[in-house]
A protein has these predicted regions:
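Conserved N-terminal beta1-alpha1 strand-loop-helix module at the mouth
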Residues: 1-138, 148-239
């Protein structure tokens, strides 16, 4: 089943709605120029609140798959290793999503806990970036299923010459499908409740990422759109 990441979470209420809807990953943006930036102190409280709520629910309702603990992902743009490491520990995050000009060595420093966002203009550029940033220890056939269930190799977003995300552009799905046949990718780029099922059918990605497509306003989620997005994404049957 396709993984779903709700990004740009800024408050506990939105986080809990996303988790209750069946979201697999929650994303927190630690890039201050972003209108969805959230301070580490706030994220720490959100993560703690989600953990407490999920623990309480799973104690009451055994084996309820709609209330499993999501992965908590920190989104960074050209931050230092020290800054990222401190925030990871302080906020108790599971993974790092890197959106800037980080080097392959920088990505590999996190030993499988990080994945790189790429915004290629063409399939040729995508292939070049993939070879540059391919994880140092890709899954072998024996552990591929397990590894693919944890994190994607890349997040594929729409190209923009200056923006690091939230471009308002739709990613080239034909290019994305070519990449998704070879590597587990997270598809981003103007996904909404109305187009995510079509995108999954066309691309067959490891997962899908949404932020503005489920917002009431920048930094605040529309709860009904969150539920509709997750339902639409999870409703696509995968071979």
């Amino acid at each position: 089943m396709t993984k779903v990441k709700i990004c740009g979470i800024t408050n506990l209420e939105d986080a809990l709605v996303a988790v209750q809807a069946g979201t697999d990953l929650l994303g927190f943006i630690f890039y201050e120029p972003s209108p969805r930036y959230v301070a580490p102190e706030v994220v720490r409280d959100i993560v703690s609140g989600v953990r407490c709520q999920v623990s309480r629910v799973t104690c009451q309702v055994s084996r309820d798959s709609s209330h499993t603990l999501p992965k908590f992902v920190g989104v960074f743009v050209n931050a230092s290793l020290e800054t990222i490491g401190q925030i990871l520990d302080y906020c108790q995050l599971d993974a790092v999503q890197l959106h800037g000009e980080e080097t392959p060595e920088f990505v590999n420093h996190f030993q499988g806990r990080a994945f790189k966002a790429i915004r290629p203009q063409s399939l040729e550029e995508a292939e070049r970036l993939i070879q540059k940033y391919l994880p140092a220890s890709p899954p072998t056939p024996s552990n591929a299923k397990r590894s693919h269930s944890l994190l994607p190799y890349f997040l594929l977003d729409a190209y923009h010459p200056s923006l690091y995300g939230g471009t308002g552009h739709v990613t080239d799905w034909t290019m994305a499908a070519n990449i998704a046949r070879q590597y587990p990718i997270m598809l981003a780029g103007s996904l909404t409740p109305s187009n995510v099922a079509v995108a999954i059918q066309a691309v067959k990605p490891w997962g899908v990422d949404v932020s503005s497509g489920v917002e009431a306003e920048k930094g605040r989620k529309d709860h009904e759109k969150v539920r509709e997005f997750v339902k639409a994404a999870k409703g696509v049957k995968r071979e």
